[in-house]
């Protein structure tokens, strides 16, 4: 096999350098890029990935989370709404049995929790450790405490 330099010998030095750099560029899988767009809150790119069917919303990624879980974890309500609009399952569990509502409660996102509940998220779903979403609420998260008032909290 010819060396890299020999392969690009017919090009000018500038073109050769450009082509050699292009060969070295890193390409990430679509799901990695998709999750990065979710974490950054880039709604335009998230929507584009879904519309072009480059990703599945049901996939549990190597992080152990699905796309909706990642959006909740980032605290971006608009991204959560977009994923739900395109069919993300609000009842989907991650590798530890957490639903998006568990994450919203644990991380202190009352607007997201309220939105998920308005769509019918199960307040009584338990994760693999037997915790309800309300069990994970820090008492300092007053809005969440109020939202779940009347349900058992430790």
Swiss-Prot record:
Which cysteines pair up through disulfides? They are none
Listed GO MF terms:
phosphatase binding; protein phosphatase inhibitor activity
Name the SMART domains on file: ANK (SM00248)
What is the protein's quaternary organization?
A: Interacts with DYSF and PPP1CA.
Name of the protein in its database record: Protein phosphatase 1 regulatory subunit 27
Under SUPFAM superfamilies, the record lists: Ankyrin repeat
Which residue ranges contain the repeat ANK? 63-92, 96-125
A Pfam family per the record? Ank_2
Q: Tell me the function of this protein.
A: Inhibits phosphatase activity of protein phosphatase 1 (PP1) complexes.
Keyword list (alphabetical) reads: ANK repeat, Protein phosphatase inhibitor, Repeat
């Amino acid at each position: 096999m010819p060396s890299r330099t020999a392969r690009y010998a017919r090009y000018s030095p500038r073109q050769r350098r450009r082509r050699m750099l292009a060969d070295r560029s890193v390409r990430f899988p679509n799901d990695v890029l998709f999750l990065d767009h979710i974490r950054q809150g880039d709604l335009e790119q998230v929507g584009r990935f879904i519309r072009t069917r480059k990703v599945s919303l049901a996939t549990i990624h190597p992080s152990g989370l699905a796309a909706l879980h990642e959006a909740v974890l980032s605290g971006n309500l608009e991204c959560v709404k977009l994923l739900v609009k395109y069919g993300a399952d609000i009842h989907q569990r991650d590798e530890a049995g957490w639903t998006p509502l568990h994450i919203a409660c644990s991380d202190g996102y009352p607007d997201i929790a309220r939105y998920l509940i308005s769509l019918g998220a199960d307040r009584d779903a338990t994760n693999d450790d037997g915790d309800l979403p309300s069990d994970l609420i820090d008492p300092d998260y007053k809005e969440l405490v109020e939202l779940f008032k009347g349900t058992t909290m430790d």
